Amino acid sequence: MDSDDEVVEEAVEGHLDDDGLPHGFCTVTYSSTDRFEGNFVHGEKNGRGKFFFFDGSTLEGYYVDDALQGQGVYTYEDGGVLQGTYVDGELNGPAQEYDSDGRLIFKGQYKDNNRHGVCWIHYPDGGSLVGEVNEDGEMTGEKIAYVYPDQRTALYGKFIDGEMLEGKLATLMATEEGRPHFEVTSGSSVYHFDKSTSSCISSDALLPDPYESERVYVADSLISSAGEGLFSKVAVGPNTVMSFYNGVRITHQEVDSRDWALNGNTLSLDEETVIDVPEPYNHVSKYCASLGHKANHSFTPNCVYDLFVHPRFGPIKCIRTLRAVEAEEELTVAYGYDHSPPGKSGPEAPEWYQVELKAFQATQQK
């Protein structure tokens, strides 16, 4: 992102002045294989120009006396973009960063190429971190907050490099010129980063999530023989995060090697990890820190599993609405068992699912 790294000029395509220096529009290739295309005045970059770096990233902007000045656009090799303000070739001032899908992931200030002042880090799931970064540009301090996807519910307190050490429930009351104003809830419980392991689901299994508690509750399912289900407390629109699916973290190999009866609350997180809510934690009297495992299956679901970076649980999955949902409506998801595993005649799924699948397919054929 720094526009004036020390590089040795190797080849010039374009007009040269009487001293053999680039003059006018030229393409200059450096010993590092970085390339610059733009306007020169007697060997110095002046006017519009663009660096093409060896790793596939680029930097484009307006140069004055060989240094990038004003608005510049740095494009990462993966397609992400940083739009920032440059002074004498260094990031100084407001900046915004977007991922390769065009989603805003950072908004704040830079000083001498480091993040500075109050900054916002936005996650793809809708949550965000906000606070005044330290001298290294890290979210470290005692006035940092994680803000849930509703942009109102927050956990405010002490963080180190974005990890919550001690957070209390707070409400984001207003944001003025990028600076948030929080009101901490009196008598709030204290939350901290508490990522599960293969043997520990949570250090405080009965401490509910404050965001989830406002949106869902557990009651007897309306689906026959399904036991308990997950219901919405409030009417919400589509694409709303409703609940979180935390659990112990085990391997796919462990899940595949055991009986289906033990896999009633397993959910794949990624290629290595499966989240599981085993006995006795499937009972809310033993575990209620998250409730996403209570959502039952439907072939016509109103919700979907989605990835989520949680301030307390770390990388997990959440339950997000597919459509508008009414208050008191049961939330359902498609469990997504493999209907056509290689070398097998039927779905790789528990018996109850296979029975429901046949019944659903029969209704679709009518």
From Swiss-Prot:
One of its GO terms (biological process) is DNA damage response. Gene3D superfamilies: Histone H3 K4-specific methyltransferase SET7/9 N-terminal domain, SET domain. PROSITE patterns: SAM_MT43_SET7 (PS51577), SET (PS50280). It is found in: Nucleus; Chromosome. It holds the Pfam family MORN. It comes from the Eukaryota. Residues 214-336 form the SET domain. The keyword Repeat applies. Its main location: nucleus. MORN repeats lie at residues 36-58, 59-81, 106-128. It catalyses: L-lysyl(4)-[histone H3] + S-adenosyl-L-methionine = N(6)-methyl-L-lysyl(4)-[histone H3] + S-adenosyl-L-homocysteine + H(+); L-lysyl-[protein] + S-adenosyl-L-methionine = N(6)-methyl-L-lysyl-[protein] + S-adenosyl-L-homocysteine + H(+). InterPro entries: Hist-Lys_N-MeTrfase_SETD7 (IPR017155), MORN (IPR003409), SET_dom (IPR001214), SET_dom_sf (IPR046341), SETD7_N (IPR054533), SETD7_SET (IPR044436). One of its GO terms (molecular function) is p53 binding. Histone methyltransferase that specifically monomethylates 'Lys-4' of histone H3. H3 'Lys-4' methylation represents a specific tag for epigenetic transcriptional activation. Plays a central role in the transcriptional activation of genes such as collagenase or insulin. Recruited by IPF1/PDX-1 to the insulin promoter, leading to activate transcription. Also has methyltransferase activity toward non-histone proteins such as CGAS, p53/TP53, TAF10, and possibly TAF7 by recognizing and binding the [KR]-[STA]-K in substrate proteins. Belongs to the class V-like SAM-binding methyltransferase superfamily. Histone-lysine methyltransferase family. SET7 subfamily. The SET domain is necessary but not sufficient for histone methyltransferase activity. This is Histone-lysine N-methyltransferase SETD7. It comes from Mus musculus.
